[in-house]
Amino acid sequence: MTIMRKTHPLLKIINHSFIDLPAPSNISSWWNFGSLLGICLMIQILTGLFLAMHYTSDTATAFSSVTHICRDVNYGWLIRYLHANGASMFFICMFIHVGRGIYYGSYMLSETWNIGIILLLTTMATAFVGYVLPWGQMSFWGATVITNLLSAIPYIGTSLVEWIWGGFSVDKATLTRFFAFHFILPFIITAFVLVHLLFLHETGSNNPSGLNSNSDKIPFHPYYTIKDLLGVIFLLMVLMILVLFFPDVLGDPDNYTPANPLNTPAHIKPEWYFLFAYAILRSIPNKLGGVLALVLSILILATFPLLKSSKQHGLMYRPITQTLYWVFISNLLILTWIGGQPVEYPFTTIGQIASISYFTIIVILMPIANMIENNILKLYY
């Protein structure tokens, strides 16, 4: 008798995606992060759903409703901190996932890569509107500063900002619509994830060697389900250590003060996962130029398939580009650090150098390194 999972219309889809899926036999633990992102998304949707049951999206009661969740709701503190720190874990996994894609040349699966960029942008939008909801000082001023950047768009900028605010400042209408966006966006992300997987399963996964692995495939289950399970256990362990021992280490103390439009915090800054882009934004003195650099800092990922001219796939056997890659990662960490520092010397200068380096490495140095490596290959082969 034929196994039900292979014949049932619904189970058949799950079977082809997670059980009998042919996967390369040599993919390393760097390929675990896709499944970890799926787990993070499920944690965020579930904890978010329970938080939404008790949260009120009104400027008068938003802050106190979050306090009520932490103090009066059974395990409300746990749900709230799981949600807040779950977002940080989500971004850590996402940055590693993108970094692995760049290192091993996964961007050559262009449809999957481009949907991934859309997913990254959508997740960043979701996290931004979510950060506004507790209605603390940093929530309010973060929302004011970031949405106000749209006023840099010529001609329609000011009208666009007022349209998003629902008035002449960040107020009740803004909070209500941000809550609506924050609720719906994770489901849009889930839909994009399915499209991401659809495109991935059309071509099959990349692998560390960068060679075609069609001649050497193994079933996803049990091999990679067990391997992924180890990653999931490790992820949950780190998340629970964060939640139970250091719940506020990644947050901002200013957000424990209710929003006050009459009092500006000393240093307005977003959550840590946006600091690299924020540093790039601040390093350009012109407002419109800063906004363009901010957007390009993410959209530049789309240029990777276009700028690749190397004969080899991935950076495994390309020492020059490999060195540039790690310089790029170090540069990202410097930008993240600078984004959290006040706007004064020497931080502004370091930020400007790091911002120029960020774009130079991708657009100029990596393509040059590709050409050099190709010429070295020609000499020996």
UniProtKB/Swiss-Prot annotation:
Belongs to the cytochrome b family. It is found in: Mitochondrion inner membrane. GO terms for biological process: mitochondrial electron transport, ubiquinol to cytochrome c. Heme b b566 binds at residues 97, 196. Binds 2 heme b groups non-covalently. Heme b b562 binds at residues 83, 182. SUPFAM superfamilies: a domain/subunit of cytochrome bc1 complex (Ubiquinol-cytochrome c reductase), Transmembrane di-heme cytochromes. Its cofactor is heme b. The cytochrome bc1 complex contains 11 subunits: 3 respiratory subunits (MT-CYB, CYC1 and UQCRFS1), 2 core proteins (UQCRC1 and UQCRC2) and 6 low-molecular weight proteins (UQCRH/QCR6, UQCRB/QCR7, UQCRQ/QCR8, UQCR10/QCR9, UQCR11/QCR10 and a cleavage product of UQCRFS1). This cytochrome bc1 complex then forms a dimer. Keywords: Electron transport, Heme, Iron, Membrane, Metal-binding, Mitochondrion, Mitochondrion inner membrane, Respiratory chain, Transmembrane, Transmembrane helix, Transport, Ubiquinone. This is Cytochrome b. GO terms for molecular function: metal ion binding; ubiquinol-cytochrome-c reductase activity. Heme 1 (or BL or b562) is low-potential and absorbs at about 562 nm, and heme 2 (or BH or b566) is high-potential and absorbs at about 566 nm. It comes from the Eukaryota.
